[in-house]
Each structure stands twice: as structure tokens, then as C-alpha cells.
Amino acid sequence: MLKPFLPLLIFVLFFTFANAQKKPAAEFYKSGITFKNNNKLTEALTAFNKAVLFKKDYDSAYVEIGNIYIKSGNIDGGLSNYKKALAINPTYTEALIGMGKIYRDAKPNYDSALIYYNAALKTDSTNKETFYALAWTHNAKKEFDKAIPYAIKALEIDNKYKPAYGELGYAYRSTKKFAECIEQLKKNLAVSVVDVAFLYSGYAYTELNNKEGALQQYEELKKINERMAAALKQKIDKMEVQD
């Protein structure tokens, strides 16, 4: 009598078991997040590892494990766990960015870093850090013209994002596009006042031997950041010596 119902019974038991496995996995993951937020990384790592024991395809837990390994200096451990997450979910943005950071910083391979950052960009085009990372990596490869639009895009997302100004200023200076640099920074300064934008704009004016323009940037910069203003003034003073 039970034979016709046996396949259904097996399915129900399997489904029940699978759901039972998911519940402790989610609980361990949640406790891992709590430990992480309280900077208890050893306890967090234990919790996340228990989560993936109960749920082998827990991509978020693998990413958290990878992040902890990277933070503790275990680069290979981080790499391995990011790869596990991407094997489950190839479009997992955080894992793609994590891989990009490894190949940008810990295991320098800029071509590989660009592959992962560009993949991350396809899944999330609103992340300023990804655009910044692309600008940084292109600058590191001395591909300065390619770096410029990525730095600009990062600033379109967050006009006060200072790391992007650093890459933008470096790329413009390396290509000697000083007039273009000034025009772009004028646009940024029209959106919001940012000290580093005045600084790089002032440097560009000195490169064009435009002392008046450089001094204007210096006066504005002095109002908001005296230390940066002093650095710019040193550059301007050298122009005066050369006159």
C-alpha cells in the first residue's frame, strides 16, 4: 500500500531536511555578523564556517570568511573563499571586488584586477569604490587616459570622495593635461567645496605658469585647509623664484 506513495514520502523528507539545514545556517550567519560588528573576528569566523557546514552554497558566508581572512593577512584563504562564493554566484559584487583588491594590492596582477573590477561594474554601476579602483589600476599601468573617466565617474557618484581626486589629479598631471584638469575641477567645485580639488587645481595653474590662477586657488584653499594651502604656497613661491 505504501509503495505508490514512497517517492512522495522521500521528497517530503528531503525537503524537510533541507529546510532544517537552512535554519541553523542562517542563525550561524546572523551570529557571525553580530560578532564581526563587535570586532570579535575569531568568533565570527567560527560562526560563518558553521554556516557553510549546514549550507554548502551559502555564498554570503563564504564572502564573510574571505573578508576576515584578508583582514587577518591570510590572502590565500581570502582568495579561496571569494572563489567559492563566485562559483555559486558569478555576479556576486562584493566577491568580485574582493578578488580585484587581492590582485591590485596583495598579489599584484593588474590585468586580473581589471577583469574583476569590470565584472563588478556590470553588476553594480553605482559603487564609487569600483570606479576609483579602476582609475587607480589604470594609473598603476600608466594608462592615464583610461584612468581619467573612471575617476570622474567616481566623483559623479560622490563629489567629496577624496581618493578619486587623487587619481584624477595624478592622471592629469601625468598626461600634462593641465588646462583640462582645471576645467574638470571647476565643475566639481561648482557642486561642492572640496579642499583637494582646490589643491590640484592650484598645482595645474602652476604648471601652466599662471600665478594669478594659482594664487586664487591658494586663497580659497587657505579658508578650509591651511596645511594643504601651505603646500600649494610652496609650489607658488618656487614659481616666483624662477621669474
Predicted regions and their residues:
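Structural marker of alpha-solenoid helical repeat scaffolds
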Residues: 54, 88, 123, 157, ...
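Bacterial Sec-dependent N-terminal signal peptides
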Residues: 1-25
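Helix-start (N-cap) detector for alpha-helical repeat units in TPR-like alpha-solenoids
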Residues: 24-26, 59-60, 93-94, 128-129, ...
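N-terminal leader/linker segments that initiate helical-solenoid repeat arrays
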Residues: 17-54, 59, 243
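Terminal, low-structured helical/coil segments at or just beyond the last alpha-helical repeat
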Residues: 24, 192, 199-243
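Position-specific recognition of the canonical hydrophobic site in helix A of tetratricopeptide repeat
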Residues: 29, 36-37, 63, 69-70, ...
